[in-house]
Amino acid sequence: MSRFLVRLSTVVSKGATGKSVLPQKRIFAGIRLISSSTGLQSLTRYDQSTDWQRKLSPEQYVVTREKGTEVPFSGIYLNHNEVGMYHCVCCDSPLFSSEAKYDAGAGWPSFCEAHGTWEKDESHANIVRRPDNSLGSTGTEVICKHCDAHLGHVFEDGPDPTGQRFCINSVALNFKPREK
């Protein structure tokens, strides 16, 4: 393990900028390097230097980067029924299959499971769940595993067999139809 950490710090230091050569505070959290310097970047995540405000529309930016929520019943994918895959608008990771989409009547596109889920195991899915207390009650936020984009929330009031309702903002998604 120590050889791995030495090798990891060598790889990271080769990409260091002038600012990051100065002494800095580093914390190893699993394989992800977290640094107080702007010169170091995560080895497992989307490029942190991405200019999201330039890449995204204002509404996409507010929802995905500032944890906003689009107006209910306004999203382009709410009543969308085409067969295909919904991807992260920020990093293009596949998130939800149209086969898992259903009408929950909640005002946002709803899915019963994330793409890559196998018998409730989401380790191969491109989403992460996080506790969210921002609305005054405990909920579960859904974010993109690769770029930390806020996607929406998940609730335990969905249909069988999963019992889950992923309530996802349309502006956080791009749809790609299935090739024929």
Curated annotation (Swiss-Prot):
GO CC field: cytoplasm; mitochondrion
Residues binding Zn(2+), per UniProt: 88, 91, 144, 147
PROSITE patterns with a match to the protein in the record: MSRB (PS51790)
Keywords: Metal-binding, Mitochondrion, Oxidoreductase, Transit peptide, Zinc
EC number: 1.8.4.12, 1.8.4.14
EC class name: oxidoreductase
One GO molecular-function entry: metal ion binding
Cofactor(s) listed in the protein's UniProt record: Zn(2+)
Active-site residue list: 167
Organelle transit peptide residues: 1-41
Record's catalysed reaction(s): L-methionyl-[protein] + [thioredoxin]-disulfide + H2O = L-methionyl-(R)-S-oxide-[protein] + [thioredoxin]-dithiol; [thioredoxin]-disulfide + L-methionine + H2O = L-methionine (R)-S-oxide + [thioredoxin]-dithiol
Chief subcellular location: mitochondrion
One of the GO BP terms on file: protein repair
Domain MsrB: 49-178
Pfam families in UniProt: SelR (PF01641)
Family statement drawn from the similarity comment of this UniProt entry: Belongs to the MsrB Met sulfoxide reductase family.
Primary role: Methionine-sulfoxide reductase that specifically reduces methionine (R)-sulfoxide back to methionine. While in many cases, methionine oxidation is the result of random oxidation following oxidative stress, methionine oxidation is also a post-translational modification that takes place on specific residue. Upon oxidative stress, may play a role in the preservation of mitochondrial integrity by decreasing the intracellular reactive oxygen species build-up through its scavenging role, hence contributing to cell survival and protein maintenance.
Designated name of the protein: Methionine-R-sulfoxide reductase B2, mitochondrial
